[in-house]
A protein has these predicted regions:
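Second-shell loop/turn segments in exported
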Residues: 41-45, 72-86, 93-96, 114-122, ...
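Short, small/polar residue-rich loop motifs at catalytic or cofactor-binding pockets
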Residues: 42, 47-51, 184, 236-240
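Hydrophobic alpha-helical transmembrane signal-anchor segments
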Residues: 1-33
């Protein structure tokens, strides 16, 4: 019995010794090997970016869309330490360079970095990322992300805007970033010692961003941009912008800027990029010139001070305080009706009507038409313009303001003001987002600024601008009656503070059909250099070319 107990004790102590020895071996003698084994599996929680919301035009044409991509990174230590990398660093760099879009020398430098993490490429298209993975280079790994793609490249580029690393930089991408970006998900990734994933599991699924449907029509936008490009080639202006709008709703069918911006290949210079991204349809502050004359005329009509047929004795110049203001061309003293004053764009006539109203009444109508305030179009960078208070008027202000000098407006403000006249006197908020996730955008109600009868009288008078003897008489669209107003405004020289004799803004704003307007177009050309400086010969023909396409395209009946 004692012998049997002794055997059991011997066996027990033998097993205990073996366990102690194994512990000593694993914990002390083989700890480095164990650490290497543990390191063969690394667990990380990675963020999975949400697909950004798609932006389409009014007919569903995709203008901006997210697609899967990968950020490609490398652990240079793992690359250099791998004994199986027979191709060497130079060979690895040679294979990687064309896939990640970098020079071979740049990739080689990255692979030689004294760091455990280096980006080789960000937002690499999925197909190219897959090709990188297929190289089986140790330490090279990919992290899922999304990349924003613009299928039409330059189309509505300043409206859409661009993305930065932390969200939208400009345009709608910036203005609606909160709803476009969605909500990122998370995933659990187990990787081997070479950084290659062994298993991937979702922790939280990502939530895609909202889908934006715009009021923009891609075909009208394309036509508008093509016309502005032609203006650029012929007149070589500093820049140009155009807006096409439905006056009854305020829906913007096109908003174009020139020079164009390539969203696929934007400028690398920060200053150049910022200038190219500027949407001058909402940000350009300028003195409107003669397109502003409808403000004084509309106010005087509404107050009952004049009628369309009221006659005025108009010389070719007028003295206001210490200033002498001239009509564009010399002429003998003549009798002009209100309608003829608009059609021939008489400065003296507009000033005469403005003086009938007086400072306070004129200022009231400036504000009624929406000047001095943002329109609420929903695009970043919108300016308010600059409108004087009557207390800020000088003795000569009523010689400047009725003819569009001395106050600043934006193209979108001018388009909205004319849209109110086209829409029976009701001013509506211009808008460019039609729906979010299929739900129609909520829009404020319009409000009346002039009576329907006054709006109709102004529309009728504006037809004379495109009739024989008008300042845009050579512009026509077969089958359609047109109405509108030219503007040629001298810019203030920033060095002298005086009006320049070489720098002008040429503009035209009009609508059709004249008696029942369905479509409005505004064209503003900043500092045309060659050929002409006048709104009637620079901007008005561009208006005609845009409307010549858009009216029949939209199925608007001739009239």
């Amino acid at each position: 019995m004692q012998k049997r107990v002794g055997v059991l004790f011997a066996v027990f102590f033998g097993l205990l010794a073996i366990a102690a020895g194994r512990t000593l071996y694993l914990g002390v003698l083989h700890s480095a090997a164990l650490r290497r084994a543990a390191n063969t599996q690394q667990v990380t929680i990675e963020e999975v970016p949400a697909p950004r919301g798609t932006i389409t035009d009014r007919r569903g044409t995709v203008l901006a869309i997210s697609e899967p991509a990968d950020d490609i990174s490398v652990d240079p230590y793992l690359v250099k330490a791998d004994p199986n990398l027979t191709k060497g660093l130079l060979g690895a760099a040679e294979e990687l360079a064309p896939l990640v879009g970098s020079a071979q020398a740049t990739v080689l430098t990255d692979l030689n970095e004294q760091s455990g993490f280096v980006y080789l490429a960000k937002a690499l298209p999925a197909a190219r990322a897959k090709a990188v993975t297929a190289l089986n280079i140790p330490g090279v790994s990919e992290t899922p992300t999304m990349r924003l793609v613009y299928p039409r490249n330059t189309l509505a580029a300043q409206v859409l805007g661009m993305m930065g690393e932390n969200g939208g930089l400009s345009g709608l991408e910036y203005a609606d970033n909160t709803i476009l970006r969605g909500k990122a998900g998370k995933r659990r990734v187990v990787s081997d010692a070479h950084g290659q994933p062994i298993s991937i599991a979702d922790v939280h699924r990502e939530v895609p961003g909202a889908q934006l449907k715009l009021t923009v029509d891609a075909n009208i936008q394309q036509r508008t941009e093509a016309v502005l490009s032609a203006v650029g080639k012929v007149f070589h202006p500093k820049d140009a912008t155009a807006i096409v709008m439905q006056p009854d709703s305020g829906a913007i069918l096109a908003m174009a800027s020139w020079p164009q911006l390539s969203l696929d290949d934007p400028p690398t210079s920060k200053a150049t990029l910022e200038a190219a991204l500027e949407n001058r349809a909402v940000s350009f502050n300028y003195e409107p010139g003669s397109t502003f004359k409808v403000v004084a005329v509309s106010g005087a009509l509404q107050k009952g001070l004049i009628t369309p047929n009221t006659e005025f004795d108009i010389p070719d110049q007028i003295q206001v305080a210490n200033r002498t203001i001239h009509d564009a061309e010399e002429h003998p003293e003549e009798m002009l009706t209100t309608g003829q004053i608009l059609a021939q764009s008489s400065n003296v006539g507009a000033i005469t009507i403005g003086k009938l109203e007086g400072e306070n009444t004129f200022n009231e109508w400036v504000h009624r038409f929406g000047f001095g305030a943002r329109t609420g179009v929903g695009l970043p960078g919108e300016e308010t313009g600059q409108v004087l208070k009557p207390s800020e008027y000088s003795g000569s202000s009523m010689g400047n303001l009725p003819i569009g000098q001395g106050e600043l407006v934006t193209p979108i403000q001018m388009a909205s003001a004319y849209a109110a006249l086209a829409n029976g006197g009701i001013l509506r908020t211009p808008h460019i987002v039609a729906a979010v996730n299929g739900h129609p955008a909520k829009l404020p109600r319009g409000h009346r600024i002039v009576s329907a009868s006054v709006a109709a009288e102004v529309r009728q008078m504006l037809r004379g601008v495109l009739a024989p003897g008008g300042t845009a008489s050579e512009v026509s669209v077969p089958g359609y009656t047109l109405a509108g107003k030219t503007g040629t405004a001298s810019k203030v020289d920033p060095e002298t503070g005086e009006y320049s004799e070489t720098a002008y803004v040429a503009s035209f704003i009009g609508f059709a059909p004249a008696s029942d307007p369905k479509l409005l177009c505004a064209v503003i050309v900043d500092e045309p250099q060659d050929g002409s400086i006048y709104g009637g010969t620079v901007a008005a023909p561009a208006f005609g070319q845009i409307m010549d396409f858009a009216l029949p395209y939209l199925g608007i009946p001739p009239g």
